[in-house]
UniProtKB/Swiss-Prot annotation:
InterPro entries: Cell_wall_hydrolase_SleB, SleB_dom1
Family: Belongs to the CwlJ family.
Matches recorded under Pfam families: Hydrolase_2
Keyword Hydrolase: yes
Localization per Swiss-Prot or TrEMBL: Secreted
Gene Ontology biological process terms from the UniProt entry: cell wall organization; sporulation resulting in formation of a cellular spore
Physiological role: Probable spore cortex-lytic enzyme involved in the depolymerization of cortex peptidoglycan during germination.
Cellular compartments per GO CC: extracellular region
Entry's Gene Ontology molecular function annotations: hydrolase activity
Keywords noted in UniProt: Cell wall biogenesis/degradation, Germination, Hydrolase, Secreted, Sporulation
The protein's name in its UniProt record: Cell wall hydrolase CwlJ
Length: 141
């Protein structure tokens, strides 16, 4: 069962975002970026109180994804990426992104905190940051 409402266009949109943000980190990295995005749709806390759809999440401004400003994001999603997006929408979670709401790619080590949120792990190039369960209980359900 899907963890967020969606249509086929949103599955492809999520797939394009996952590829544009983390293709260099492979399938697992793309799944983690997808986890972070879906967590933003599920959450109604912190930076994401009015994000209720995949489309809202992908194009959130300010605070959205840098990849949406680059041409590569607008290329059609491949079937393999669409399959990964479906897995995330169905609720598959990958550590350290299981409860994350933010990620970024630093040049060096992951900062312990990023905008007041704690680092929960790194996968290849990306550092992941999660809220506390007290601040954002929806992403811990």
């Amino acid at each position: 069962m899907a963890v967020v409402k969606h249509n086929e266009a949103e599955v492809e949109l999520l797939a394009r975002l996952m590829r544009a943000e983390a293709e260099g980190d492979g399938d697992l990295g793309m799944l983690m970026v997808g986890n972070t995005g879906i967590n933003r749709v599920i959450a109604s806390c912190l930076d994401f109180p009015n994000i209720r759809t995949i489309t809202n999440m992908v194009y959130q401004s300010p605070g959205g994804f840098e990849a949406t400003q680059k041409g590569y994001f607008y290329q059609r999603a491949r079937q393999s990426e669409i399959r990964l997006a479906r897995r995330v929408i169905q609720g598959e979670r990958q550590h350290p992104a299981s409860n994350s709401l933010w990620f970024f790619m630093p040049e060096g080590a992951c900062p312990e905190q990023w905008y007041g949120q704690w680092n929960v792990g790194r996968y290849k190039a990306h550092c992941f940051y999660a809220p506390t369960a007290a601040d954002c209980p929806e992403v811990f359900r």
